[in-house]
Swiss-Prot record:
<feature type="compositionally biased region" description="Basic and acidic residues">
    <location>
        <begin position="33"/>
        <end position="42"/>
    </location>
</feature>
<feature type="compositionally biased region" description="Gly residues">
    <location>
        <begin position="174"/>
        <end position="202"/>
    </location>
</feature>
<dbReference type="InterPro" id="IPR044673">
    <property type="entry name" value="DCL-like"/>
</dbReference>
<dbReference type="Pfam" id="PF11523">
    <property type="entry name" value="DUF3223"/>
</dbReference>
<feature type="modified residue" description="N-acetylalanine">
    <location>
        <position position="2"/>
    </location>
</feature>
<dbReference type="GO" id="GO:0005634">
    <property type="term" value="C:nucleus"/>
</dbReference>
<feature type="compositionally biased region" description="Basic and acidic residues">
    <location>
        <begin position="51"/>
        <end position="65"/>
    </location>
</feature>
<keyword id="KW-0007">Acetylation</keyword>
<dbReference type="GO" id="GO:0009793">
    <property type="term" value="P:embryo development ending in seed dormancy"/>
</dbReference>
<protein>
    <recommendedName>
        <fullName>Protein EMBRYO DEFECTIVE 514</fullName>
    </recommendedName>
</protein>
<keyword id="KW-0539">Nucleus</keyword>
<comment type="function">
    <text>May play a role in ribosome biogenesis and in determining the rate of cell division. Involved in a process essential for nuclear and nucleolar functions.</text>
</comment>
<dbReference type="GO" id="GO:0051302">
    <property type="term" value="P:regulation of cell division"/>
</dbReference>
<feature type="region of interest" description="Disordered">
    <location>
        <begin position="168"/>
        <end position="202"/>
    </location>
</feature>
<feature type="region of interest" description="Disordered">
    <location>
        <begin position="1"/>
        <end position="69"/>
    </location>
</feature>
<dbReference type="GO" id="GO:0017126">
    <property type="term" value="P:nucleologenesis"/>
</dbReference>
């Protein structure tokens, strides 16, 4: 019966387009939640989520809040990462860092390195940016009190303190054993050879 009424209404609207069709719109008025209703809603959500409450989720988010490294404070892992990338590329190589940066880097190792005591050893005299002898890239090095030097990955330390987005993690850091190294050829220019030049010449 309701279907027939809708069909009649739509036909009459098509026949006489000037005729206005009255429609009642049900408006949902927001109703204030009492404390008991809110508690019941949270408890049902908690049961649906397998026992996780919002308070636990908030606690997890707080871990990604501001972090102090020495006198410097970082709100996100990306901001922390960007700071160290800029520092690494703009600081002159083989030059001791200043006291401010020394405190930041020391705190980075203490809070983010997997084995800080082993890395620090008998104490850190200074930090430097050096060209890594094997990788030929700029790296942070710490110089201990006994003048031994060791490099460390600021990226891994940052990721330990505040987890980095997946696309910024080190290759192979996801624990699957893949990644790292140069890999073998492939891609746009193929595997071996293919150096400079254009076409093959006879």
């Amino acid at each position: 019966m309701a279907e027939e009424q809708e069909i009649v209404d739509s036909l009459s609207a098509e026949v006489n387009p000037d005729q206005k069709v009255d429609m009642e719109v049900e408006t949902a008025t927001p109703k204030a939640e009492t404390g008991d209703e809110k508690r019941e809603r949270e408890e049902t959500e908690e049961e649906e989520n397998g026992g996780e409450s919002k308070k636990q989720k908030v606690g997890e988010e707080e871990k990604s809040g501001p972090v102090k490294l020495g006198p410097k404070e970082f709100v996100t892992s990306v901001a922390m990462f960007d700071y160290f990338v800029k520092f690494l590329h703009f600081w002159p190589t083989d030059l001791d860092v200043n006291k401010y940066e020394h405190m930041v880097l020391l705190d980075l190792i203490k809070k983010g390195h997997s084995e800080p005591e082993k890395k620090i050893g008998g104490g850190i005299k200074t930090f430097q940016v050096r060209t890594h002898p094997m990788w030929k890239s700029r790296c942070f090095f710490l110089v201990r009190e006994d003048d031994t030097a060791d490099d460390f990955s600021f990226r891994k330390c940052v990721d330990q303190i505040l987890p980095l987005p997946e696309n910024m993690k080190t290759p192979g850091a996801n624990g699957n054993g893949h990644g790292g190294g140069r890999g073998g050829g492939g891609g746009r220019r193929g595997g071996r050879g293919g150096g400079r030049g254009g076409r093959f010449r006879r």
